[in-house]
Amino acid sequence: MKILKSFTPRILVIGDLMIDHYLWGNCERISPEAPVQIVDISKETTVLGGGGNVVNNLVALGAKVSVSGVIGNDENGVELLKLLREIDVNVDNIVIQEGRKTSKKSRVIAASQQILRYDKESKEEISKSSIEVILNSLAKDISRYDAVVLSDYSKGVLTKELCQGVISTCSKNGIKVLVDPKGSDYSKYSGAYLLTPNKKEAIQATKIDIKDKQSLKEALLKMKKDANLAISLITLSEDGVAIYDDEMKIFPTVAKEVFDVTGAGDTVIASIAFAISAGKSIEESAKFANLAAGVVVGKIGSATVSISEIEEYEASLHKSTSDAHIKGFEEIEAIVKRYKESGKKVVFTNGCFDILHVGHVKYLQIAKSFGDVLIVGLNSDTSVTRLKGPSRPVNIAEDRAYLLAALEAVDFVVPFEDDTPYELIKMIKPDTLVKGGDYEGKSVIGTEFAQELKLVDFVDGKSTTKTIQKIKGDLHV
């Protein structure tokens, strides 16, 4: 990973460039004109899509990226160039073709659900003159690149003539070509270093129903032979990545939580291209891509991932289960954002949990039942001392957090230094705030930031104080 972090590969992306346009709003009415929903738009966002998302991923990893493709002489084309320049991408080799529409996909989203998509684009093959310009530019600048990525979304840019021209030029100059393919005819990519279809795409292209390791191997071999590849590769979603060079190897997925698989394929080809350019083997590159995909599917939408995020993620995989669920303020803020964006209901409670007992466990189980994710705020040692006296806590915060995080009902534990979790609740803004039944009729800190307050009765006769008394022999039962 250190070598990858210190290396800046120069990568050219050629393919279908597009804009992903999102319109966010609320839908609470039906139109009087027709039986359709009315969406009141409150926010609009635009990001790079298609091959542009591969570019985004490469830039996030730290690559120096150039882009080649064809756009129209239109407003969307101007916007796309602006988005690329904003992330410091070389756009000198993008061709503007008269009469062609720049691809823009607009999605209307309400209540976290996509309810409509409309597209503006051209799908016909690009002109002969556009192909010549791209190939001439590649031949002139080939020494500037460590690898070339072809990102095919079947929008007419990556014709067979262009693909074969690119692969031929790169082959003569010792440059590897990696392809994210589309369609069932992989012959147009013949001679590439590798392709990265997903399982569904591989089945479509090879006509082999991949249902076990033997059929997977057959599909990999057929791809390798039919497209004259150095290496064949198939992404297997939650099962990881399979490759075939001289034998089949499967690298299992390492994703801990999956929020959204949108754009995961772009992350895979970008990370493999990045690692291959740094001189890594295909095995090392596949493992790196798996880690990158494991991070990106934990985000919402066509997201990207950095080397630092991958390093942190890899380190977290080696932590114990409990350690991985103990978070700081910044970490939990990002985690809560992802859960809420995916429509999950967040529950929060807090306490000292000094000597964990059955009353605590049952309380936390009930709290978890109010939503999808339970976050427990944990008073620090100094906070417990201020609240409970100089003899407390019995167990230090590190031990208390570890025990809580090991409980099935608890998703995350967040230690805090203040006497109350006010700032933590303010940041999280839980759907449900849970407190003990002894708060009946009392003011509860942070209720103004929660959608609802739930009071849960304690288990009779179970408390940390009584446990301590019993240990001391002061309580006879």
Curated annotation (Swiss-Prot):
Pathway, per Swiss-Prot/TrEMBL?
A: Nucleotide-sugar biosynthesis; ADP-L-glycero-beta-D-manno-heptose biosynthesis; ADP-L-glycero-beta-D-manno-heptose from D-glycero-beta-D-manno-heptose 7-phosphate: step 1/4; Nucleotide-sugar biosynthesis; ADP-L-glycero-beta-D-manno-heptose biosynthesis; ADP-L-glycero-beta-D-manno-heptose from D-glycero-beta-D-manno-heptose 7-phosphate: step 3/4
> Which sites are catalytic?
266
Protein's GO biological process: ADP-L-glycero-beta-D-manno-heptose biosynthetic process
Report the GO molecular function annotations: ATP binding; heptose 7-phosphate kinase activity; heptose-1-phosphate adenylyltransferase activity; phosphotransferase activity, alcohol group as acceptor
Q: Where does ATP bind?
A: 198-201
Query: Its function?
Result: Catalyzes the ADP transfer from ATP to D-glycero-beta-D-manno-heptose 1-phosphate, yielding ADP-D-glycero-beta-D-manno-heptose.
Note the subunit structure.
Homodimer.
Name-wise, this protein is Bifunctional protein HldE
Organism, by scientific name, is Sulfurimonas denitrificans (strain ATCC 33889 / DSM 1251) (Thiomicrospira denitrificans (strain ATCC 33889 / DSM 1251))
Q: Which gene encodes it?
A: hldE
